[in-house]
């Protein structure tokens, strides 16, 4: 090490006081190793079951799992009622902070029970029954959580659609799920201004022939003007506000579907990931208690993710509430009205556990430490990272600046498909390594394998860098139960690559070090990870080609220090199209309009042609080399290797 390089620690053991009082002890690993199914049965029995399960796991129909067979429970009862019945009704369930300063609401568990019961009665009055689907297209407001729990209470599947998605994205999800009801708001606040939301909902519904949606339930959030369809559109405050606050929950089978959540797929069509009740809630509750070490009597937990993403489902709704924890929900952006907002919220509510994405951490780093340093963040006792691998520099900055150099930091790896966290340090046990998600949780089994499914040896310093595939070799309770309406796609997407081994293929590259720590390196397929959001290349390419001037498009993810990956597009224009100075910006805007602002390409390069194999396949791997200014890889299968001279000249 040179004298100019400051020495930094390679691992960070937990403080003695934290370790002494941690929920998870080292014995958990031994217990799970000795009898994995008995271990999961013990975790499941922390929930309230109306009918006990008779079998922990039925894997006879692999890769379709059945967990806690024969058991019956109600997810909403486990998240709300049982805490009230245990005498904790006065405990705050949700501190909600709106984006406009001073806009706040506090709901105790008793308040939440009344609101969820009213919403459940209202949905029943609208004719919804168990097994129906409800689309939820809302900003991060209490009604979003209430709507989710009301659906869970009735055995209705909710399909939450991120409020930043466009009408086209909403339309595709409504059609695929055949949703019977849409819950939305008049608008939402973004960067201090109200923006319409119902208008996009109206546009989506208008584009659906023989639309399955019978009613649209509208929350008044901003007061902005909007179109109204008499008979179809109903005000939330009228319908839910007048409903009875008394409702008796019905138990459902452990495998009863709980929700659909759509995620990007390499074919372009979003995949409806299906999760069920008992297994999902078991692992959700378990990981919340062990990874985040929650103490319901004293902790205030804040997961910054929107509920439109799986992190918002699992650690913004079900995880905290099934453990009886107090949580913070914040509607807006981190820089509204200024860059102090997140730190003001931590200080205001005494947040003790803060869970966010590396993109936001890197943004805070750019802003400078003087902003967090001007706030009292001493309430924080644990930090978490989610959504993408975190680089060691950001990890250390996060711990040192936000955590005061004293808090454990849990870097969690998981996916929409896994339902809950799978790989993470346990904060009272692990000596965490910056940049590593560490080891699979007790009860979880993962491997790093080569193309043949054989385990790779640990990577050692100075050795050739070998990246393997991250696979899961044993079923887990919160695993997806399929892709809605497409079992063949489920098998092909996750199980076909290593079908002879029975491994779940996560789609991420990873390596393992001599200590057994796993280092996840990111996506290896054609799904890009932009600020923790998975965007498929096919979706973006489709949006580009829809433009009248574009003949062909190819999109790749490239390294970006702020968002992990940024989208770089290469387009071939139609011969009769006259490009102009604003062509690239016009295409960027079009992608943002069709998909989401998140999917807006950072770079758009107009090129004369795209590199293709002799079979006509676009070689994105080589385009990625160009975008990253690297030397080209193997070009032997290219139809015309000279194409890159023209591409580089155009770039």
Curated annotation (Swiss-Prot):
pH dependence: Optimum pH is around 8. The enzyme is stable under neutral and alkaline conditions, while its activity decreases rapidly below pH 6.0.
Domain of life of the native organism: Bacteria
Matching CDD domains: ACS
MF term (GO), any: acetate-CoA ligase activity
Documented EC number(s): 6.2.1.1
Binding site for CoA: 190-193, 311, 531
Catalyzed reactions per annotation: acetate + ATP + CoA = acetyl-CoA + AMP + diphosphate
Effect of residue 617 to R: Complete loss of acetyl-coenzyme A synthetase activity
Residues holding ATP: 387-389, 411-416, 508, 523, 534
Enzyme class of the recorded protein, top EC level: ligase
Cofactor(s) the protein needs: Mg(2+); Ca(2+); Mn(2+); Ni(2+)
Residues the record lists as N-acetylserine modifications: 2
Signal peptide (from-to): none
Pfam family, one: AMP-binding
Keywords: Acetylation, ATP-binding, Ligase, Magnesium, Metal-binding, Nucleotide-binding
Cofactor note: Magnesium, but can also use calcium, manganese, nickel or zinc ions.
InterPro entries in the cross-refs: Ac_CoA_lig (IPR011904), ACAS_N (IPR032387), AMP-bd_C (IPR025110), AMP-bd_C_sf (IPR045851), AMP-binding_CS (IPR020845), AMP-dep_synth/lig_dom (IPR000873), ANL_N_sf (IPR042099)
PTM-bearing positions, type N6-acetyllysine: 617
Temperature dependence: Optimum temperature is 37 degrees Celsius. It lost its activity rapidly below 25 degrees Celsius or above 45 degrees Celsius.
GO cellular component assignments: cytosol; peptidoglycan-based cell wall; plasma membrane
Post-translational modification: Acetylated on Lys-617 by Pat in the presence of acetyl-CoA as an acetyl donor and ATP. Acetylation results in the inactivation of the enzyme. Deacetylation by the SIR2-homolog deacetylase CobB is required to activate the enzyme.
Miscellaneous information on this protein: Could be also autoacetylated on Lys-617 in the presence of acetate as an acetyl donor and ATP. Autoacetylation is effectively inhibited by CoA. If CoA is not available or the concentration of CoA is low in vivo, the enzyme can transfer acetyl group from AcAMP to itself, resulting in autoacetylation and inactivation. When CoA is available, the acetyl group is donated to CoA forming AcCoA.
NCBIfam families: Ac_CoA_lig_AcsA, PRK00174.1
Annotated function: Catalyzes the conversion of acetate into acetyl-CoA (AcCoA), an essential intermediate at the junction of anabolic and catabolic pathways. AcsA undergoes a two-step reaction. In the first half reaction, AcsA combines acetate with ATP to form acetyl-adenylate (AcAMP) intermediate. In the second half reaction, it can then transfer the acetyl group from AcAMP to the sulfhydryl group of CoA, forming the product AcCoA. M.tuberculosis may use AcsA for both acetate and propionate assimilation.
Annotated protein name in UniProt: Acetyl-coenzyme A synthetase
Gene encoding the protein: acsA
């Amino acid at each position: 090490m040179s004298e100019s390089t400051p020495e930094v620690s390679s691992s960070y053991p937990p403080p003695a006081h934290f370790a002494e009082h941690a929920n998870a002890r080292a014995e958990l690993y031994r217990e799970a190793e000795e009898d994995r199914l008995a271990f999961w049965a013990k975790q499941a029995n922390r929930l309230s079951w109306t009918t006990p399960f008779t079998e922990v796991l039925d894997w006879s129909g692999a890769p379709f799992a059945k967990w806690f067979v024969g058991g019956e429970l109600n997810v909403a009862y486990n998240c709300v009622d049982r805490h009230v019945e245990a005498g904790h009704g006065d405990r705050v369930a949700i501190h909600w902070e709106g984006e406009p300063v001073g806009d706040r609401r506090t709901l105790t568990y008793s308040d939440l029970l009344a609101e969820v019961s009213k919403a459940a009665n209202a949905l029943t009055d609208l004719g919804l029954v168990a097994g129906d689907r409800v689309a939820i297209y809302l900003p991060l407001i209490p009604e979003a959580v209430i709507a989710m729990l009301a659906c869970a209470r009735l055995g209705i599947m909710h399909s939450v659609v991120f409020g930043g998605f466009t009408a086209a994205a909403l339309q595709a999800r409504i059609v695929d799920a055949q949703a019977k009801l849409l819950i939305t708001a008049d608008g939402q606040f973004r960067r201090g201004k109200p923006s319409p939301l119902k208008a996009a909902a109206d546009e989506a519904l208008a584009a659906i022939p023989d639309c399955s949606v019978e009613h649209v339930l509208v929350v008044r959030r901003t007061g902005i003007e909007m179109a109204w369809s008499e008979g179809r559109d109903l005000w939330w405050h009228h319908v839910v506000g007048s409903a009875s606050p008394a409702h008796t929950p019905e138990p459902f089978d452990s495998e009863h579907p709980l929700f659909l959540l759509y995620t990007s797929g390499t074919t372009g069509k979003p995949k409806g990931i299906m999760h069920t009740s008992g297994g999902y809630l078991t692992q959700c509750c378990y990981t919340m208690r062990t990874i985040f070490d929650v103490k319901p009597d004293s902790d205030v937990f804040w997961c910054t993710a929107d509920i439109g993403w799986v992190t918002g489902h699992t650690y913004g709704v079900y995880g905290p509430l099934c453990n009886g924890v107090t949580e913070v929900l914040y509607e807006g952006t981190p820089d509204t009205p200024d860059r102090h907002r997140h730190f003001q919220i931590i200080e205001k509510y005494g947040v003790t556990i803060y869970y966010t994405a590396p993109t936001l951490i890197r943004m805070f780093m750019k802003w400078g430490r003087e902003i967090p340093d001007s706030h009292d963040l001493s309430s924080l006792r644990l930090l978490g990272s989610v959504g993408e691998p975190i680089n060691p520099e950001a990890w250390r900055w996060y711990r040192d600046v936000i955590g005061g150099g004293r808090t454990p930091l849990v870097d969690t790896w998981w996916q929409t498909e896994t339902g809950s966290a799978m790989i993470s340090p346990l904060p009272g046990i692990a000596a965490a390594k910056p940049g590593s998600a560490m080891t699979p949780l007790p009860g979880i089994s993962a491997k790093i394998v080569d193309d043949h499914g054989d385990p790779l040896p640990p990577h050692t310093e100075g050795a050739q860098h070998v990246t393997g595939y991250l696979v899961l070799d044993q079923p887990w309770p919160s695993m997806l139960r399929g892709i809605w309406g497409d079992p063949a796609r489920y098998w092909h997407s996750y199980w076909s690559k290593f079908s002879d081994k029975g491994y779940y293929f996560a789609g991420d590259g990873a390596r393992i070090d001599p200590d057994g720590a796993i280092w996840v390196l990111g996506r290896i397929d054609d799904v890009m990870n932009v600020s923790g959001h998975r965007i498929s290349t096919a979706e973006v390419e489709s949006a580009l080609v829809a433009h009248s001037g574009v003949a062909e498009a190819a999109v790749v993810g490239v390294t970006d220090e702020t968002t992990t990956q940024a989208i770089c597009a290469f387009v071939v224009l139609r011969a009769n199209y006259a490009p102009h100075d604003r062509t690239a910006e016009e295409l960027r805007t079009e992608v943002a309009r069709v998909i989401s602002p998140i999917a807006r390409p950072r770079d758009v390069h107009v090129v004369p042609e795209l590199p293709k194999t002799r079979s006509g396949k676009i070689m994105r791997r080589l385009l990625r080399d160009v975008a990253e200014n690297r030397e080209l890889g193997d070009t032997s299968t290219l139809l015309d290797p000279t194409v890159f001279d023209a591409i580089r000249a155009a770039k």
